[in-house]
A protein has these predicted regions:
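Conserved helicase core region in the C-terminal RecA-like lobe
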Residues: 97, 121-126, 275-281, 570, ...
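Conserved helicase NTPase motor core
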Residues: 19, 217-326, 333-338, 346, ...
Length: 753
């Protein structure tokens, strides 16, 4: 049990706009605590005297003397530093994403001099770790099968849910495999995740939908609300029976079952008596429940809140849910930005101009507009302004950010090509290109289909030719095409490559290309022999061998290629692990203690894996998500959501497609998200409500981005969008009011291009 104590009066709630010094103030408060030996004032656990909150009987006699004889423990520790560490327990540090976590962890490590154990994670990472750690409690409470859980990746979750619901008859009007089916499945899974993060029981989802939404419609669901509840509960039961965890299931297990348990709360307070939470405006509602429990137990906390943030509103975040947490803290407003930015002076006038175009006023010289007719002209002139400014020494590449409401592939490619040709590096923030868009990954998938029988329909001539070019460095595309035309033998079950002399004029290939092809051919034959003899353990081993033999070869590939290969291996390992678990459930797993599947099942799993990757569902985002070492000197390309999530700032910002309507309507909110916010009235969600939500989001975006702009802002607008339609977005008033970029800034380079 925990000593009854009033809610901590030393907890701080730091609120302020973008770059107002909230995180710095958090670090300063921790430094003050360390210098003043603050752990002396923290409430400590005492021996349990109530059976309700006590640990299980079998642990009580063993744990009580060691954990709760405080005087004996402190006397054994001896040094004052060790005593302070014992009183403080472990510090829980929560951040909105992993990049912010690492930055803040480095700063706190310097302040505490590594004297206190510090656990740094994200809210979702914390929920997942707690569910895994206390899985035995959940097994006992929910009467689950005792097996270690496996967390499903989102792409695997969608794949398995689609197959389950297809077998249950998702909807007769939905064509299996169609884009509409994928969208319907994604909507259902998102509803489960939103309900879990908001603390809403899964049984109440149909009632929420019936009160807030109109059934059907272009963006609605093709099933009735009662069917939504039945499908979600079937999916939930299916996952729990097999020990599979999704993000939504993790949120439900933690918020609904684990957090209310007295035994868990007991261990929670024993481990954490200090919580540091940065950017709580991006946390889900169940995180607010966690903080309230910790406050009731007497924990000390520092929380930072940005009213202009809420980047993940609509994706599970619920800023209004933390009002109850703030009520039990000492609120410290930080109204003024700690650094100079355009937002200090111009945030209010710009927001007013966007909300009411008739209130226009001249914008300063620091805000300029670049207007063209075609988008191709806009991209080129934007790049040329950046090149000229860097060459003139006005700004460094790492001080420039190009931000768009939707950074499409054409814009990324065009800007990257122009800037890199002038010697400027480009950083695409969380580009998330599908793995199947990379030639090396496509080559490895073709290789898998050639080694394992029964996958011939997944191999074509173009794929084989590309594989030869990628794996055989001495084979150019022309020779690869000749080899494929004469030496590739298609077959539904056993496609194969023939010896080079099957090409009558093989002498035209040359020695280098012939040698490279024969090396690939002999390697394939060796792997096929091992696979037939059941020596090849799994496709994961084959992928690793292929990478080591053909792609690595002792050199160091670029980071982007390494990240793609790592993500491919991580995805393959995860997919095979899940397949082995599912096969074990149906008693089809071989009796050997490894993860080998029966041959027919392994081929089917491999076919599904190849099709999943080729569908573009998997992107290259392995762990860690950023490159180690010093930040490179590069121009940043990002969309609005990615840039705001990264919490970065730049001297110069270029707002690409400033006239696009996506600044207002380009929300990434999940289906039905407003119904699971604590601010929802409980009535029908109307078009007026949605418009008000869009306008509030646009205001937050403007204030946030202006607060991250140091000196110059360029509003880049083309009359025609990439699809040829005229752009009439909400920021067009700003584009027309801003001073145009001087013609000398672009005329010289444009005339020479």
């Amino acid at each position: 049990v925990i000593v009854d104590s009033p809610l901590s009066s030393t907890s701080l709630w730091l609120t302020g706009p973008t770059r107002s010094g909230k995180t710095t103030r958090l670090v300063t408060e921790v430094r003050r605590w360390v210098e003043l030996a603050w752990p002396d004032d923290l409430p400590q656990p005492v021996p349990p005297d109530s059976r309700q909150d006590a640990p299980p009987e079998r642990h009580r006699e063993r744990d009580t003397p060691r954990l709760f004889d405080r005087a004996l423990t402190l006397s054994i520790l001896g040094s004052e530093t060790a005593k302070r560490q014992y009183r403080a327990g472990k510090l829980l540090l929560l951040t909105a994403n992993s990049d912010n976590r690492q930055d803040l962890l480095d700063r706190l490590g310097e302040v505490t001099r590594q004297a206190y154990p510090l656990r740094a994670t994200t809210p979702l990472g914390f929920f997942q770790a707690e569910v895994l750690l206390f899985w035995p409690l959940l097994i006992q409470q929910l009467h689950l099968r005792p097996q270690f859980p496996i967390r499903l990746r989102p792409e695997t979750e969608q794949d398995l849910a689609t197959r389950l619901w297809r077998s249950l008859g998702l909807s007769p009007s939905i064509l299996p495999g169609s884009p509409n089916e994928a969208r319907q499945v994604r909507h259902l899974l998102d509803l489960f995740q939103l309900a879990a993060f908001s603390g809403t029981p899964i049984e109440d989802i149909p009632a929420y939908l019936s009160r807030g939404l109109v059934s059907g419609g272009e963006t609605g669901l093709a099933v009735s609300w009662s069917e939504v509840g039945a499908l979600l509960q079937a999916w939930r039961s299916w996952c729990l029976a097999r020990g599979l965890l999704t993000y939504g299931l993790i949120g439900e297990l933690y918020g609904r079952y684990l957090l209310p348990l007295p035994a868990y709360r007991y261990h929670l307070h024993r481990r954490y008596r200090v919580v540091l939470a940065d950017d709580v405006d991006d946390y889900p509602a169940i995180a607010a429940q966690l903080f309230q429990v910790m406050q009731q137990q007497g924990a000390v906390g520092v929380f930072t809140f940005n009213p202009e943030g809420a980047v993940r509103l609509g994706l599970g975040a619920d800023p209004a849910a933390f009002t109850a947490v703030a009520q039990h803290c000492q609120v410290e407003p930080l109204p003024q930005p700690a650094v100079t930015s355009l937002g200090q002076t111009w945030a209010e006038p710009i927001v007013a101009m966007v909300q009411d175009p008739t209130m226009g006023e001249p914008l300063p010289e620091a805000i300029q507009s670049l207007q063209t007719v075609a988008r191709s002209q806009l991209l080129r002139q934007t790049a040329e302004i950046i090149i000229q400014a860097v060459q003139a020494g006005e700004v460094e590449p790492q001080e420039i950010a190009v931000i768009a409401p939707g950074m499409d592939a054409i814009a990324r490619y065009t800007l990257t090509e122009i800037l890199t040709k002038q010697g400027l590096a480009v950083e695409s923030l969380n580009e998330q290109r599908p793995l199947a868009s990379l030639p090396r990954v496509r080559a490895l998938l073709t290789l898998l289909a050639l080694v394992y029988p029964g996958l011939g329909r997944l191999v074509d001539r173009e794929g084989v030719a590309e594989m030869l070019v990628v794996l055989g460095r001495q084979i150019d595309p022309v020779r690869a095409g000749l080899i494929t035309d004469h030496c590739f033998e298609p077959h539904p079950d056993t496609p194969r490559l023939l010896p080079v002399n099957a090409f009558p004029r093989w002498d035209r290939l040359g020695y280098a290309a012939t040698t490279a092809y024969e090396q690939i051919l002999h390697w394939l034959e060796d792997q096929q022999t091992q696979q037939a003899q059941r020596v090849l353990a799994s496709p994961i081993v084959l992928l690793d061998r292929a990478i080591q033999t053909f792609l690595w070869q002792g050199n160091q590939p670029p980071y982007a290629q390494v990240a793609a290969l790592r993500e491919l291996m991580e995805t393959a390992q995860h997919y095979w692990e899940v397949a082995a678990r599912l096969q074990a459930e149906t008693a089809l797993l071989s009796p050997t203690p490894d993860t080998r599947l029966p041959t027919s099942d392994a081929v089917q799993v491999l076919a599904n894996f190849i099709q999943l990757l080729r569908s573009g569902a998997v992107t290259a985002n392995p762990y860690p998500v950023r490159q180690a070492g010093a930040a490179q000197s590069a121009v940043m390309l990002a969309n609005v959501f990615q840039y705001r999530s990264s919490r970065r700032s730049h001297r110069w910002q270029f707002w690409l497609d400033a006239g696009s309507p996506r600044w207002l309507t380009g929300s990434d909110a999940l289906f039905g998200a407003p119904l699971f916010l604590s601010t929802w009235s409980g009535g029908a969600w109307t078009t007026a409500d949605q418009l008000a939500l869009y306008e509030q989001r646009l205001e937050r975006i403007l204030r946030d981005l202006l607060g991250r702009t140091g000196e110059r802002l360029f509003l880049c607008h083309s009359d025609l969008a990439v699809n040829g339609q005229e752009q009439m977005g909400p920021l067009l008033t700003l584009v027309n009011a801003a001073l145009p970029v001087p013609m000398s800034a672009t005329s010289e380079l444009t005339s020479g291009s």
